[in-house]
Structures are given as C-alpha cells and as structure tokens.
Design a protein with these regions (language model features):
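Secretory-pathway/luminal and periplasmic proteins that interact with or process carbohydrate-rich
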Residues: 22, 107-112, 182-186, 465-468
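Active-site-proximal cap/lid insertion segments
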Residues: 3-156, 160-170, 219-222, 226-264, ...
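Long, internal low-complexity/basic segments
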Residues: 123, 248-264, 269-274, 281-422, ...
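Short glycine-biased active-site loop of nucleotidyltransferases that positions the nucleotide triphosphate
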Residues: 115-119, 178-181, 203-204
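Acidic/polar loop patches that form or flank catalytic/metal-binding clefts of enzymes
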Residues: 136, 144-147, 164-174, 184-190, ...
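Small-molecule pocket liners
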Residues: 124-126, 185-187, 203, 210, ...
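Extended catalytic-interface subdomain
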Residues: 15, 151-155, 160, 192-197, ...
Length: 506
C-alpha cells in the first residue's frame, strides 16, 4: 500500500514472508521461536509433535517431532499472513484485477530440504490466481492442477508476457502463462554449489516422471557440517545418531546422514515422491534404463547449452575475471580474451565416480589446471592406491589443485605432514575463497589437523567480528574446527537483535 500510487496506476509488488525461513523453523533458539512465531497463533493452531506426519527420511525421535511441529506452526503463520495480503487487495478494490502468484524459493529449511537436489529441496509450491477478467490468460480452468514443468528462470519472461512486453534476447526462461505461451520443456536443470563455508558440486535434471542427480563430491556426506544449519536441533539429532548410534537410522536415513553419497542417482518421482530408492542401486527395467540414458545425455547437453560454469574451480573463475578485466558472464559468452572450454571441463568432472583411473592419471599431467583439479577428485572417488602420486602437486601453480591434493593427502600416509603444512600456508592466501577452501579442509580433518590449531585460532580471531562474506565464512569454518577440538569460541546467534543479520524492515 502506498499513498503515492494513483488510483488507476498499475503495480507490481513482491512480498517476502520470512515466517518459514530456516531461521524460524530450526535455527533460532526455541524460546525465540515461541516469542516471535508461536505466540501469534491460537492454541488450536499450534501443532502437536506427537501427531505431525514425519517424512520417512527422518528418525522418529521426540527432538525431531518437536521441531517438525515447529515447522508446521511457521507454515500456519505464513498462511495467515498471506490471507491478510489477499484481504488488503479486496479492501482496496484491487482483487478483481490483480493476478497473484504464491510460491516458495526452495524446499523447507529443514535437513534434506533447502540446498539439496532432491524434490524435497527443489520442488516448491506454485499457485497462480487469475481474476475473472484475466482468466483467458490462464493455462487451465480455476481450481485445476497443471502438471507442467516450471522453473524460476521462467518467471520474468512470464510476467513480461502477461503485460505485453517482449522478452529480451538474453533471457533464458519461457512464458508459461498468457496468450502466446511457450511449449513446456522436457526437463528442468538444477544446480548445487558452495553455500557459505560448505563446498559442494552437484547437478540435477528433472522431467515430469524422473529425477537424475549427478554428485561430483561423492566422498562428502549430504549432511556436511554447516554452522548455520547445525544450530537446528533436527540436524544435531541426525548427526548425533549417525555418529553415536547409526543402527537407529534405517538405510533411507543413512543415505542422507552417512559419510558418502553416490556419484549418480535416478528416481521415479511418481512411484517414489520422497526420492528414497535410487534405481541405479537395483536392476533397472527396460523402460527405466532407457529413461536413465536419456536423462544423462540430456543433462550433458543442457549444461553446455546453459553455459554452466560449475566445473570450473572458483579460484580459476576469479583469475579469469581479474586477468581479462570483465565479468564471468561476458567470459562465458566469449566476449573477452578467451572462451572457456566448458565441454573439456565437464568431461574431466565426469571422471568422478567412473573408475577410469588411467584417464585420470593422464589428466593429472595436463597443462590445464581444471583437468588436474578434477583428476585428483576422480582418483579420490575410488583410486586410493594412486594417492601418493599427488605429493608433487602440493607445489602446483594453481591454488585449486594444490589445496585439493593437500586435502586428500592430509588424511594419512607419507605426505600427511607436508599436506597439512600446505593447507596452513594457504590460510594466509590473499583471496578469501582460496583461504576458505584450505580452512574447510582443515576443519573436516578435525583431530588429524591438531597441528594447525595455532593458525586456525589466529584466523578465527582475525575474522570473527569483521564484516563481509569472506570473514563470515572463514569464522564459520575456523570456529567449527576450534569447537571440535574443545577450544573456546564465541557462540553464533542469529535471533532478532543479536546483530548477525540486519533487522527486518517494519
């Protein structure tokens, strides 16, 4: 609502309801959740932990039930807030000529939701309400469910189409609403990369029926340590059970909580909406095998069509941006000194999980640091007998290669001390993203990296109270390492007024 808007003036407004944000559902201390969320509900609206339906990938414990009920309470408040906005449209006489979109940005902020490539992380609610005067722009009748595949990249194009504006040439999305809708795609492409201090690389391809997932760091758990997420009680409970009493977790639950993950996964989303059964771990039917091959080929084609740079290590991208004095966007379009060989980069990445260690050993000698980087990860995913070949790469000209080699070697063997020394040295790198990669490697080493304790203490103290992404993530990772070794750190607090985030506008 704005007093500056003329009565007949068209408007476009976005309301972000934070009631179901990860901070509310799981991260805030429970007493803060009660004060900020639950206190706004009636007694009848508050959910009984004993009665909430748990997803099958969660262990059924009182801790998990309490927090899942908390999530439902957050959803209830969000629902009420949405109703209030719709009522305001009616009160202002705008409901009969306003198209309303309702959607989330990703799956729930609970474990195995947000940040994951499963449907629990990538599939979200999308409802669109057309008033009678605009129902000719809808793809189906009021109250119906439309099963078309839609991606967020389609939203700008669709809104522009609804108001009669042609999409710009550079826009990738299709228009799924309006008089001249674009055809439905066969697939939706999904990405998973570094989040805060947590390094990861995964991709997905979703058709109406199947979900294909490609994991490029299979040596890492789905449930990697993450300071912000680990403040939640459900995460703590799952991690504790996996470490102390794994027999209390079934196979489905250990798929998330276990120490590793498959390089590839394929799910029948119609028969298995929770993505519990990886079809590649059983015998595929003729139809499933054909679908799997089609999805894998389509994924390999789609990543090039979209110019996905995810196979390029972060430090290499930054080096190009600096050397060529332009954006990564222009570099990918070939508007600078060179056009990245994305096909080469992804081909090297595809060696991970394929057991083709002879090709990986050849790429280890490549002049291209991207190929050397992926060769190390490919060997780490099963080629353990080749680990000693990496000692010389601790002095590689590429920071990405040096650190990846050191990360693996530091877990044991003849090169362990030299590898840890390399990681400690990289903590002083001028680029925070390089220092962070080394810091994360040391964090996950835990007790094996006790020799890095003085350097990690120094790094933590230098960054804990500084502003900016780099210091924030470095303090996350270094602090988690110190906590694991029993050192004293300043607890993280993301509750309102704690100062970690700026307050929300009134």
């Amino acid at each position: 609502r704005s007093g500056q808007r003329r009565k007949d003036q068209a408007f476009f407004a976005v309301f972000n309801d934070m009631s179901t944000h990860q901070s509310r559902t799981t991260v805030w201390p429970h007493e803060v959740f009660i004060r900020e969320i639950q206190s706004k509900l009636t007694k009848q609206e508050i959910h009984d932990p004993a009665a909430v339906p748990l997803p099958p990938y969660y262990p059924d414990t009182p801790v998990v039930r309490k927090e899942w009920a908390r999530m439902y309470d957050c959803v209830t408040l969000m629902d009420r807030n949405t109703g209030r906005l719709l009522k305001e449209l009616e009160e202002d006489g705008l409901a009969d000529n306003t198209i309303v979109f309702f959607y989330s940005d990703h799956g729930t902020g609970m474990p195995r939701g947000k940040r994951m490539l499963y449907d629990s992380g990538m599939r979200v609610a999308l409802m669109v309400r057309f008033p009678r005067c605009y129902q000719h722009l809808a793809p189906s009748l009021p109250g119906t469910v439309n099963g078309e595949l839609v991606s967020f990249v389609d939203f700008p194009t669709t809104v522009m189409n609804l108001v009669g504006i042609d999409k710009a040439e550079y826009m990738q999305g299709r228009s799924f609403l309006g008089g001249n809708r674009d055809p439905e795609p066969d697939y939706i492409y999904g990405c998973r990369d570094r989040v805060d201090e947590v390094f990861e690389c995964g991709r997905s391809l979703r058709s109406r029926k199947y979900l294909y997932i490609r994991n490029y760091h299979p040596h890492l758990s789905h449930n990697q340590p993450s300071v912000f997420s680990d403040l939640g009680r459900t995460r703590q409970e799952i991690t504790r059970l996996a470490r102390e009493d794994p027999k209390k977790l079934n196979e489905v639950q250990m798929d998330y909580a276990g120490p590793e993950k498959p390089a590839e996964a394929f799910y029948d989303c119609d028969a298995d909406p929770h993505n519990l059964v990886n079809l590649l771990e059983g015998v595929l039917t003729v139809e499933q095998r054909a679908a799997f091959r089609a999805h894998r080929l389509a994924y390999e084609s789609e990543r090039l069509r979209l110019r996905d740079p995810g196979a390029i290590p972060e430090d290499e991208m930054w080096r190009w941006v600096r050397d060529e004095k332009t954006s990564m966007y222009d570099i990918l379009l070939g508007k600078s000194d060179h056009k990245p060989e994305l096909a080469m980069a992804w081909s090297a990445a595809d060696l991970v999980g394929r057991s083709d260690f002879q090709t990986a050993l050849k790429l280890l000698k490549s002049a291209n640091p991207i190929e050397r980087y992926w060769a190390i990860l490919a060997l780490r995913a099963g080629g353990y007998e080749h680990r000693d070949n990496l000692v010389d790469y601790l002095e590689d000209i590429s920071a990405s290669v040096r650190i990846e080699a050191a990360d693996w070697l530091a877990w044991g063997g003849s090169g362990q001390k030299a590898a840890l020394d390399r990681l400690v040295k990289e903590l002083n790198h001028e680029d925070w993203w390089v220092a962070l990669r080394a810091c994360r490697a040391i964090e996950l080493l835990g007790e094996k990296a006790r020799g890095a304790l003085p350097a990690m203490k120094k790094l933590y103290l230098e960054n804990r109270t500084q502003k900016g992404d780099g210091p924030f993530y470095l303090a996350f990772s270094a602090g988690a390492f110190l906590d694991g070794l029993g050192e004293k750190t300043q607890p993280w607090n993301f509750a309102p007024g704690a100062g970690a985030f700026t307050p929300e506008p009134k």
